[in-house]
């Protein structure tokens, strides 16, 4: 049965301001509910070093999928001096294109000022005057809400010159993307923002030293930045106490796919996937059986029913062979062909490859071709062997960025748990070697 907890500022720092209809919280209501108090506290009573230290103590990790410590990332920015210059940038990664993921859109459309306040506090910590929100181009309504919120924040004196009576200047700009998944990678995002082709960059140099227009740059996710204000309002001890695991705070989590009540909820780290699946999402719809689930987007490995009791956090999901990712899970019922499902996923990643490196550019289309052959049940035994070889050749360290390694995770896990389904797609009467597959690479 679907049963939701009541939201309070002590238990749900990201969503407690929402009413029952989940209307957008504009600045008057946001300020009435302690909005911008954290930013005022930071500007009037803290130094940038104090802010970074507090975020380090909080244990806040990036919510974009990698789970890198936010305070550590901020501390990597070089000092203001003649060597590194006095101009630096903060970029908010709002290019949310992971299939099945909509947590950032939810936060931007429902509590936009929470994001703006998080950006302002972060900008203060990093000595940044200009910040950019790199927004997914298809999020037209989100863009409208953010633009209106920026106008409101400017009118209330939180953006512009002499913010909160200080000598500080803060500006926030919105840049809409052109619909490329690869822009979720921070250096590809930077290239796109500069007007270049959205290819990932070589590292080093890292963006913290050579980023946007060659200046020190920090890139943070929407949900990461939205967490920041509450930490300064309620303290580190409180923030750590929200979680049921070593990962601190709460996380926007959800379930989609073949569940009764697909949705998104703010929940503590460490809650089990089963509790989300059964208590919040209501279990499988139409009395169907769960076949597989992905814990955090299309680029995360498949897990099966026995893994539902795993705590939803970065460490424990990794222990069972997947990644927490965006923490918006997808449930798949037993009527779905695993070969067709993987083919669908790989087609997306093949299409979204930037084409910069050969393994990704040629390997992903090759995988799609093989899966289409298997889907038609005209494959040969060598097809499965080649898929396994491609999983190895497109793995970590073999490609320029993490796009291909992430893309093949669903395939690797599908071969692990459902190899028989792949084998049943092989034509048992075929004595022909896979000439079609071997020759197909010449097309790319």
UniProtKB/Swiss-Prot annotation:
Annotated catalysed reactions: a quinone + NADH + 5 H(+)(in) = a quinol + NAD(+) + 4 H(+)(out)
The protein's required cofactors: [4Fe-4S] cluster; FMN
Keyword Cell inner membrane: no
Keyword list, A-Z: 4Fe-4S, Flavoprotein, FMN, Iron, Iron-sulfur, Metal-binding, NAD, Quinone, Translocase
Residues at which FMN binds: 177-224
NCBIfam families cross-referenced by the UniProt entry: nuoF_fam, PRK13596.1
Name recorded for this polypeptide: NADH-quinone oxidoreductase subunit F
Species in which this protein is naturally found: Buchnera aphidicola subsp. Baizongia pistaciae (strain Bp)
């Amino acid at each position: 049965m679907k049963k939701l907890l009541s939201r309070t500022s002590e238990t749900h720092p990201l969503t407690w301001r929402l009413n029952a209809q989940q209307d957008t919280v504009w600045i008057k209501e946001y300020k009435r509910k302690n909005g911008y108090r954290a930013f005022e506290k930071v500007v009037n009573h803290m130094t940038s070093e104090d802010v970074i230290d507090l975020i380090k103590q909080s244990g806040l990790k990036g919510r974009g999928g990698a789970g890198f410590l936010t305070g550590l990332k901020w501390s990597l920015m070089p000092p203001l001096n003649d060597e590194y210059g006095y101009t630096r940038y903060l970029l908010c990664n709002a290019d949310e294109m992971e299939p099945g993921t909509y947590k950032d859109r939810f936060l931007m459309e429902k509590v936009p000022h929470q994001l703006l306040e998080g950006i302002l506090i972060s900008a203060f910590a990093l000595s940044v005057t200009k910040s950019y929100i790199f927004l997914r181009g298809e999020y037209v309504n989100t863009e409208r809400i953010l633009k209106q919120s920026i106008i409101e924040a400017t009118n209330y004196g939180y953006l512009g010159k002499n913010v909160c009576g200080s000598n500080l200047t803060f500006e926030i700009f919105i840049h809409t993307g052109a619909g490329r998944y690869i822009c979720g990678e921070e250096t590809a995002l930077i290239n796109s923002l500069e007007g270049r082709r959205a290819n990932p960059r070589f590292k080093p140099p890292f963006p913290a030293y050579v980023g946007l227009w060659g200046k020190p740059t920090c890139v943070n996710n929407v949900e990461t930045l939205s967490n920041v204000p509450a930490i300064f309002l309620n303290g580190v001890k409180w923030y750590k106490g929200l979680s049921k695991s070593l990962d601190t705070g709460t996380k926007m989590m959800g379930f989609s796919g073949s569940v009764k009540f697909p949705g998104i909820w703010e929940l503590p780290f460490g809650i089990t996937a089963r509790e989300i699946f059964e208590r919040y999402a209501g279990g499988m719809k139409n009395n169907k059986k769960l076949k597989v689930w992905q814990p955090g987007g299309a680029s995360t490995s498949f897990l099966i029913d026995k893994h539902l009791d795993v705590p939803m956090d970065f460490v424990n999901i990794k222990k069972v062979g997947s990644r927490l990712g965006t923490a918006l899970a997808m449930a798949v019922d037993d009527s779905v062909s695993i070969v067709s499902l993987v083919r669908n996923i790989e087609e997306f990643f093949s299409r979204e490859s930037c084409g910069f490196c050969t393994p990704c550019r040629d390997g992903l289309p090759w995988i799609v071709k093989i899966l289409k052959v298997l889907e038609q049940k005209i494959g040969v035994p060598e097809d499965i062997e080649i898929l396994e070889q491609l999983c190895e050749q497109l793995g970590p360290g073999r490609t320029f960025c993490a796009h291909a390694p992430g893309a093949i995770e669903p395939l690797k896990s599908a071969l692990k748990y459902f190899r028989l389904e792949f084998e049943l797609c092989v034509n048992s009467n075929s004595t022909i070697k896979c000439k079609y597959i071997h020759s197909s690479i010449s097309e790319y």
